[in-house]
Amino acid sequence: MKKIILVAGGTGGHFFPAVALGEELIKRGYEVHFITDLRCQKYINQNMGLIFHILDLKRSDNIFLFLPNLSIAILKAIKLLYNIRSSVIIGFGGYPVIAPMFAAIFLRVPIIIYEQNSYLGKVNKFFASFAKKIAISYEDVKNLPEFVKSKIVVTGGIVRENIRNVCHSRESGNDIKRSKDNIFTVFIFGGSQGAKLFSELIPASIQILMQKQPNLKLNIIQQAALDDQVKIKDIYSKLNINYEFAEFFDNMALKYKEADLVISRAGASTIEELTYIGLPAIFIPLPSAADNHQYYNAKLLADKKAGWCLEQNSISAEELADKILDLINNPKILEDTSQNLLKRRKEGHVLLSDLIERVI
Protein backbone atom coordinates (compact mmCIF):
# COMPACT_ATOMS: atom_id res chain seq x y z
CA MET A 1 0.00 0.00 0.00
CA LYS A 2 1.42 3.37 -1.02
CA LYS A 3 1.77 6.00 1.69
CA ILE A 4 0.98 9.70 1.43
CA ILE A 5 1.84 12.47 3.90
CA LEU A 6 -0.32 15.55 4.41
CA VAL A 7 1.03 18.51 6.40
CA ALA A 8 -1.32 21.16 7.77
CA GLY A 9 -1.69 23.03 11.02
CA GLY A 10 -2.05 26.33 12.77
CA THR A 11 -5.79 26.78 12.25
CA GLY A 12 -8.84 24.75 11.36
CA GLY A 13 -8.82 26.57 8.04
CA HIS A 14 -5.74 24.61 7.05
CA PHE A 15 -6.54 21.46 9.02
CA PHE A 16 -10.04 20.54 7.83
CA PRO A 17 -9.44 20.82 4.05
CA ALA A 18 -6.43 18.54 4.54
CA VAL A 19 -8.64 16.08 6.42
CA ALA A 20 -11.16 16.14 3.55
CA LEU A 21 -8.36 15.36 1.10
CA GLY A 22 -7.10 12.57 3.36
CA GLU A 23 -10.54 10.98 3.52
CA GLU A 24 -10.72 10.91 -0.29
CA LEU A 25 -7.24 9.35 -0.53
CA ILE A 26 -8.17 6.67 2.02
CA LYS A 27 -11.18 5.77 -0.15
CA ARG A 28 -8.72 5.27 -3.01
CA GLY A 29 -6.72 2.76 -0.99
CA TYR A 30 -3.80 4.83 0.31
CA GLU A 31 -2.32 4.89 3.80
CA VAL A 32 -2.49 8.55 4.78
CA HIS A 33 -0.25 10.11 7.42
CA PHE A 34 -1.11 13.57 8.73
CA ILE A 35 1.53 15.82 10.32
CA THR A 36 0.14 18.72 12.33
CA ASP A 37 1.07 20.93 15.27
CA LEU A 38 -0.08 21.31 18.86
CA ARG A 39 -2.60 24.01 17.98
CA CYS A 40 -4.58 21.59 15.84
CA GLN A 41 -4.35 18.66 18.22
CA LYS A 42 -7.81 19.56 19.54
CA TYR A 43 -9.32 18.85 16.12
CA ILE A 44 -7.97 15.32 15.88
CA ASN A 45 -10.55 12.56 15.79
CA GLN A 46 -9.18 9.04 15.47
CA ASN A 47 -12.34 8.03 13.61
CA MET A 48 -11.09 10.11 10.68
CA GLY A 49 -9.02 7.11 9.59
CA LEU A 50 -5.83 9.15 9.26
CA ILE A 51 -2.56 8.40 11.06
CA PHE A 52 -1.69 11.56 12.98
CA HIS A 53 1.75 12.81 14.03
CA ILE A 54 2.38 15.92 16.14
CA LEU A 55 5.45 17.92 15.12
CA ASP A 56 5.61 21.36 16.67
CA LEU A 57 7.94 24.16 15.59
CA LYS A 58 8.23 26.76 18.33
CA ARG A 59 7.79 30.24 16.91
CA SER A 60 10.14 33.07 17.83
CA ASP A 61 10.86 36.52 16.46
CA ASN A 62 14.42 36.12 17.72
CA ILE A 63 16.46 34.57 14.91
CA PHE A 64 18.96 33.14 17.40
CA LEU A 65 16.15 31.20 19.08
CA PHE A 66 14.27 30.35 15.90
CA LEU A 67 17.17 28.70 14.05
CA PRO A 68 17.93 26.14 16.80
CA ASN A 69 14.19 25.39 17.09
CA LEU A 70 13.96 24.94 13.33
CA SER A 71 17.03 22.68 13.26
CA ILE A 72 15.55 20.43 15.95
CA ALA A 73 12.19 20.29 14.16
CA ILE A 74 13.84 19.43 10.83
CA LEU A 75 15.81 16.57 12.41
CA LYS A 76 12.60 15.20 13.94
CA ALA A 77 10.83 15.57 10.59
CA ILE A 78 13.63 13.75 8.75
CA LYS A 79 13.36 10.82 11.17
CA LEU A 80 9.57 10.76 10.81
CA LEU A 81 9.55 10.92 7.01
CA TYR A 82 12.32 8.32 6.78
CA ASN A 83 10.27 5.90 8.89
CA ILE A 84 7.06 6.50 6.95
CA ARG A 85 8.71 6.28 3.49
CA SER A 86 5.87 7.99 1.66
CA SER A 87 5.48 8.37 -2.09
CA VAL A 88 4.66 12.08 -1.85
CA ILE A 89 4.11 14.89 0.67
CA ILE A 90 1.44 17.58 0.33
CA GLY A 91 1.89 20.86 2.19
CA PHE A 92 -1.01 23.21 2.92
CA GLY A 93 1.11 26.27 3.66
CA GLY A 94 1.77 28.17 6.84
CA TYR A 95 4.31 27.87 9.60
CA PRO A 96 3.73 24.17 10.52
CA VAL A 97 4.83 22.84 7.12
CA ILE A 98 8.34 24.35 7.19
CA ALA A 99 10.21 21.51 8.92
CA PRO A 100 8.48 18.65 7.03
CA MET A 101 9.12 20.41 3.70
CA PHE A 102 12.84 20.76 4.45
CA ALA A 103 12.89 17.10 5.46
CA ALA A 104 11.18 16.12 2.20
CA ILE A 105 13.78 18.06 0.20
CA PHE A 106 16.60 16.33 2.10
CA LEU A 107 15.07 12.86 1.59
CA ARG A 108 14.00 13.63 -2.00
CA VAL A 109 10.34 12.96 -1.34
CA PRO A 110 8.21 14.52 -4.12
CA ILE A 111 6.45 17.69 -2.94
CA ILE A 112 3.03 19.06 -3.88
CA ILE A 113 1.99 22.46 -2.55
CA TYR A 114 -1.63 23.43 -2.08
CA GLU A 115 -2.51 27.14 -1.93
CA GLN A 116 -6.09 27.72 -0.85
CA ASN A 117 -5.97 31.53 -0.86
CA SER A 118 -6.03 33.91 -3.81
CA TYR A 119 -2.59 35.20 -2.76
CA LEU A 120 0.39 32.81 -2.59
CA GLY A 121 1.63 32.75 1.00
CA LYS A 122 5.26 33.28 2.02
CA VAL A 123 5.92 29.66 3.02
CA ASN A 124 4.37 28.21 -0.13
CA LYS A 125 6.27 30.74 -2.24
CA PHE A 126 9.55 29.73 -0.58
CA PHE A 127 9.03 26.02 -1.32
CA ALA A 128 7.46 26.53 -4.77
CA SER A 129 10.73 25.95 -6.60
CA PHE A 130 11.11 22.54 -4.91
CA ALA A 131 7.57 21.36 -5.68
CA LYS A 132 6.61 18.97 -8.45
CA LYS A 133 3.19 20.61 -8.71
CA ILE A 134 1.38 23.57 -7.16
CA ALA A 135 -2.36 23.11 -6.71
CA ILE A 136 -4.40 26.31 -6.40
CA SER A 137 -8.02 27.10 -5.52
CA TYR A 138 -8.33 30.16 -7.78
CA GLU A 139 -7.45 30.62 -11.43
CA ASP A 140 -5.79 33.98 -10.83
CA VAL A 141 -3.68 33.59 -7.69
CA LYS A 142 -1.51 36.63 -7.00
CA ASN A 143 2.17 36.61 -6.00
CA LEU A 144 3.02 33.61 -8.19
CA PRO A 145 6.63 33.68 -9.44
CA GLU A 146 6.84 33.41 -13.21
CA PHE A 147 9.17 30.41 -13.08
CA VAL A 148 6.64 28.18 -11.26
CA LYS A 149 3.64 28.83 -13.51
CA SER A 150 4.30 25.66 -15.51
CA LYS A 151 3.70 23.68 -12.30
CA ILE A 152 0.27 25.18 -11.62
CA VAL A 153 -2.88 23.05 -11.58
CA VAL A 154 -6.26 24.57 -10.68
CA THR A 155 -8.06 22.13 -8.40
CA GLY A 156 -10.49 24.45 -6.66
CA GLY A 157 -11.23 24.49 -2.96
CA ILE A 158 -11.41 21.44 -0.73
CA VAL A 159 -14.59 21.16 1.31
CA ARG A 160 -15.51 18.74 4.09
CA GLU A 161 -17.99 16.00 3.23
CA ASN A 162 -20.65 17.14 5.73
CA ILE A 163 -20.53 20.62 4.18
CA ARG A 164 -20.68 19.20 0.65
CA ASN A 165 -23.86 17.38 1.63
CA VAL A 166 -25.54 20.71 2.43
CA CYS A 167 -25.42 21.57 -1.26
CA HIS A 168 -27.62 18.61 -2.13
CA SER A 169 -30.24 19.68 0.40
CA ARG A 170 -30.31 23.26 -0.91
CA GLU A 171 -31.03 21.99 -4.45
CA SER A 172 -30.85 25.01 -6.76
CA GLY A 173 -28.11 26.95 -5.01
CA ASN A 174 -29.24 29.42 -2.39
CA ASP A 175 -32.89 28.34 -2.58
CA ILE A 176 -33.66 31.41 -0.38
CA LYS A 177 -34.55 29.35 2.67
CA ARG A 178 -37.32 31.47 4.10
CA SER A 179 -39.95 29.77 6.20
CA LYS A 180 -43.70 30.02 5.73
CA ASP A 181 -43.59 33.00 8.06
CA ASN A 182 -41.18 34.77 5.69
CA ILE A 183 -38.37 34.92 8.26
CA PHE A 184 -34.98 35.94 6.86
CA THR A 185 -31.98 34.27 8.55
CA VAL A 186 -28.55 35.90 8.78
CA PHE A 187 -25.66 33.71 9.95
CA ILE A 188 -22.80 35.76 11.45
CA PHE A 189 -19.51 34.10 12.35
CA GLY A 190 -15.75 34.60 12.42
CA GLY A 191 -15.58 37.03 15.29
CA SER A 192 -12.74 35.45 17.24
CA GLN A 193 -10.29 38.00 15.80
CA GLY A 194 -11.32 41.64 15.73
CA ALA A 195 -14.34 40.71 17.86
CA LYS A 196 -15.31 44.36 18.39
CA LEU A 197 -16.61 44.47 14.83
CA PHE A 198 -18.90 41.51 15.46
CA SER A 199 -19.95 42.46 18.99
CA GLU A 200 -20.56 46.18 18.37
CA LEU A 201 -20.80 47.21 14.72
CA ILE A 202 -23.00 44.35 13.50
CA PRO A 203 -25.57 44.65 16.34
CA ALA A 204 -25.64 48.41 15.70
CA SER A 205 -26.35 47.66 12.04
CA ILE A 206 -29.20 45.36 13.00
CA GLN A 207 -30.66 48.15 15.15
CA ILE A 208 -30.57 50.59 12.22
CA LEU A 209 -31.98 47.98 9.89
CA MET A 210 -34.96 47.29 12.17
CA GLN A 211 -35.61 51.02 12.61
CA LYS A 212 -35.82 51.39 8.84
CA GLN A 213 -38.01 48.32 8.38
CA PRO A 214 -39.67 47.56 11.75
CA ASN A 215 -42.02 44.87 10.42
CA LEU A 216 -39.14 42.76 9.14
CA LYS A 217 -39.08 39.19 10.46
CA LEU A 218 -35.42 38.50 11.17
CA ASN A 219 -33.55 35.55 12.65
CA ILE A 220 -29.92 36.03 13.71
CA ILE A 221 -27.49 33.16 14.27
CA GLN A 222 -24.27 34.65 15.63
CA GLN A 223 -20.91 33.49 16.90
CA ALA A 224 -20.01 35.58 19.93
CA ALA A 225 -17.76 35.34 22.97
CA LEU A 226 -19.55 34.68 26.25
CA ASP A 227 -18.63 38.14 27.53
CA ASP A 228 -20.32 39.74 24.52
CA GLN A 229 -23.44 37.61 24.40
CA VAL A 230 -25.25 39.37 27.27
CA LYS A 231 -25.10 42.85 25.73
CA ILE A 232 -25.91 41.59 22.22
CA LYS A 233 -28.87 39.60 23.54
CA ASP A 234 -30.15 42.74 25.22
CA ILE A 235 -30.05 44.61 21.90
CA TYR A 236 -31.74 41.84 19.92
CA SER A 237 -34.40 41.20 22.57
CA LYS A 238 -35.50 44.84 22.49
CA LEU A 239 -35.79 44.59 18.70
CA ASN A 240 -38.08 41.56 19.03
CA ILE A 241 -36.04 39.38 16.69
CA ASN A 242 -35.14 35.71 16.98
CA TYR A 243 -31.53 34.94 17.83
CA GLU A 244 -29.15 32.10 18.62
CA PHE A 245 -25.62 32.49 20.01
CA ALA A 246 -22.63 30.22 20.47
CA GLU A 247 -18.93 30.71 21.10
CA PHE A 248 -18.27 28.08 18.46
CA PHE A 249 -20.65 26.25 16.13
CA ASP A 250 -19.66 22.61 15.72
CA ASN A 251 -22.63 22.04 13.40
CA MET A 252 -21.70 24.50 10.64
CA ALA A 253 -23.38 22.36 8.00
CA LEU A 254 -26.74 22.72 9.74
CA LYS A 255 -26.31 26.48 10.19
CA TYR A 256 -25.43 26.91 6.53
CA LYS A 257 -28.61 25.04 5.66
CA GLU A 258 -30.69 27.41 7.80
CA ALA A 259 -29.16 30.63 6.46
CA ASP A 260 -30.26 33.01 3.71
CA LEU A 261 -27.21 35.25 4.06
CA VAL A 262 -23.82 35.03 5.77
CA ILE A 263 -21.70 37.82 7.27
CA SER A 264 -18.17 36.61 7.95
CA ARG A 265 -14.45 37.02 7.57
CA ALA A 266 -12.91 35.90 4.28
CA GLY A 267 -10.67 33.00 5.19
CA ALA A 268 -10.09 30.49 2.41
CA SER A 269 -12.03 27.64 4.02
CA THR A 270 -15.06 29.84 4.63
CA ILE A 271 -15.05 31.03 1.03
CA GLU A 272 -14.58 27.51 -0.30
CA GLU A 273 -17.52 26.21 1.72
CA LEU A 274 -19.85 29.05 0.76
CA THR A 275 -18.83 28.73 -2.88
CA TYR A 276 -19.52 25.01 -2.89
CA ILE A 277 -23.02 25.33 -1.45
CA GLY A 278 -23.87 28.60 -3.21
CA LEU A 279 -24.60 30.60 -0.07
CA PRO A 280 -24.21 34.40 -0.58
CA ALA A 281 -22.13 36.35 1.92
CA ILE A 282 -21.04 39.82 2.91
CA PHE A 283 -17.33 39.47 3.63
CA ILE A 284 -15.49 41.74 6.06
CA PRO A 285 -11.83 40.69 5.64
CA LEU A 286 -9.53 40.59 8.66
CA PRO A 287 -7.10 43.49 8.01
CA SER A 288 -4.27 41.84 9.95
CA ALA A 289 -4.38 38.57 7.97
CA ALA A 290 -1.01 37.57 6.52
CA ASP A 291 -0.29 39.27 3.18
CA ASN A 292 -3.81 40.77 3.43
CA HIS A 293 -4.96 37.51 1.82
CA GLN A 294 -8.51 37.76 3.15
CA TYR A 295 -9.05 41.00 1.24
CA TYR A 296 -7.85 39.38 -1.98
CA ASN A 297 -10.10 36.36 -1.36
CA ALA A 298 -13.19 38.53 -0.86
CA LYS A 299 -12.34 40.99 -3.63
CA LEU A 300 -12.02 38.17 -6.13
CA LEU A 301 -15.56 36.99 -5.41
CA ALA A 302 -16.91 40.53 -5.35
CA ASP A 303 -15.39 41.20 -8.78
CA LYS A 304 -17.19 38.09 -10.09
CA LYS A 305 -20.51 39.23 -8.55
CA ALA A 306 -20.35 36.22 -6.25
CA GLY A 307 -20.31 38.12 -2.95
CA TRP A 308 -19.72 41.50 -1.34
CA CYS A 309 -16.52 42.86 0.18
CA LEU A 310 -16.72 45.57 2.86
CA GLU A 311 -13.49 46.73 4.48
CA GLN A 312 -13.39 46.85 8.26
CA ASN A 313 -11.46 50.12 8.46
CA SER A 314 -14.01 52.07 6.43
CA ILE A 315 -17.34 50.36 6.97
CA SER A 316 -20.09 52.02 9.03
CA ALA A 317 -23.09 50.50 10.78
CA GLU A 318 -25.37 52.46 8.44
CA GLU A 319 -23.63 51.14 5.33
CA LEU A 320 -23.84 47.54 6.52
CA ALA A 321 -27.51 47.95 7.47
CA ASP A 322 -28.33 49.34 4.02
CA LYS A 323 -26.52 46.47 2.30
CA ILE A 324 -28.36 43.83 4.33
CA LEU A 325 -31.72 45.53 3.71
CA ASP A 326 -31.03 45.77 -0.01
CA LEU A 327 -30.40 42.03 -0.17
CA ILE A 328 -33.42 41.14 1.96
CA ASN A 329 -35.70 43.21 -0.26
CA ASN A 330 -34.18 41.97 -3.52
CA PRO A 331 -34.09 38.16 -3.41
CA LYS A 332 -33.21 38.05 -7.11
CA ILE A 333 -29.80 39.53 -6.23
CA LEU A 334 -29.23 36.71 -3.75
CA GLU A 335 -30.33 34.11 -6.28
CA ASP A 336 -28.01 35.50 -8.98
CA THR A 337 -25.12 35.67 -6.52
CA SER A 338 -25.76 32.08 -5.51
CA GLN A 339 -25.60 30.94 -9.11
CA ASN A 340 -22.37 32.88 -9.66
CA LEU A 341 -20.88 31.09 -6.67
CA LEU A 342 -21.94 27.69 -7.96
CA LYS A 343 -20.34 28.40 -11.33
CA ARG A 344 -17.00 28.55 -9.51
CA ARG A 345 -17.49 25.30 -7.63
CA LYS A 346 -15.03 22.48 -8.18
CA GLU A 347 -14.66 19.06 -6.58
CA GLY A 348 -11.29 20.01 -5.12
CA HIS A 349 -10.85 16.86 -3.03
CA VAL A 350 -11.25 14.77 -6.19
CA LEU A 351 -9.12 16.93 -8.51
CA LEU A 352 -6.23 17.20 -6.03
CA SER A 353 -6.35 13.45 -5.39
CA ASP A 354 -6.16 12.89 -9.16
CA LEU A 355 -3.12 15.18 -9.31
CA ILE A 356 -1.42 13.30 -6.47
CA GLU A 357 -1.94 10.00 -8.28
CA ARG A 358 -0.35 11.43 -11.42
CA VAL A 359 2.71 12.54 -9.44
CA ILE A 360 3.27 9.20 -7.71
Curated annotation (Swiss-Prot):
It comes from the Bacteria. The keyword Cell division applies. One of its GO terms (cellular component) is plasma membrane. UDP-N-acetyl-alpha-D-glucosamine binds at T11, G12, G13, N117, R160, S192, Q294. HAMAP family: MurG. The lineage of its organism: Bacteria, Pseudomonadati, Pseudomonadota, Alphaproteobacteria, Rickettsiales. It comes from Rickettsia felis (strain ATCC VR-1525 / URRWXCal2). Belongs to the glycosyltransferase 28 family. MurG subfamily. The keyword Transmembrane helix does not apply. Keywords: Cell cycle, Cell division, Cell inner membrane, Cell membrane, Cell shape, Cell wall biogenesis/degradation, Glycosyltransferase, Membrane, Peptidoglycan synthesis, Transferase. It is found in: Cell inner membrane. This is UDP-N-acetylglucosamine--N-acetylmuramyl-(pentapeptide) pyrophosphoryl-undecaprenol N-acetylglucosamine transferase. Its main location: membrane. Transmembrane segments: none annotated.
